[in-house]
């Protein structure tokens, strides 16, 4: 996308689109209350999958709920010399990238473009993964009377 978030650039709209650190979660971490997104997404911790509207590609939960591990290894200057489209991370490394933010993420970091990282052994209640199943595209119907 060309905007900060799939729904646009306004962090105040996050509560309608993603489960991030907002006014529902802030009471559990009073020290971080000033960082909370305005509004209520209805969940202080994880939310049921698919609770929020899909993005323009029809994919749910690309922001918030849990950080998602991605296959890239992290490198501080990883994108400095990479192509703009489909950049590839380093072939090896010490820490893996996670993206999208979680229920405990401030709006600044709840973006698909923001890269966070941890060692592959890291286990948190706010980190997960996305399972993907490839499916065949639907067959177009044959015109009446067409032979197989």
Regions found by a protein language model. Give the residues of each.
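Functional-site microenvironments in short loops/helix caps that host divalent-cation chemistry
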Residues: 1-116, 120-125, 132, 147
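Short catalytic/ligand-binding loop motif for oxyanion handling, primarily in non-cytosolic enzymes
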Residues: 14, 140-141
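Short, acidic Gly/Pro/Ser/Thr-rich loop/turn segments
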Residues: 105, 138-139
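Short beta-strand-to-coil "C-cap" segments at the C-terminal boundary of structured domains/repeats
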Residues: 131-138
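Low-complexity, Gly/Ser/Thr/Pro-rich intrinsically disordered linker/tail segments
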Residues: 143-145
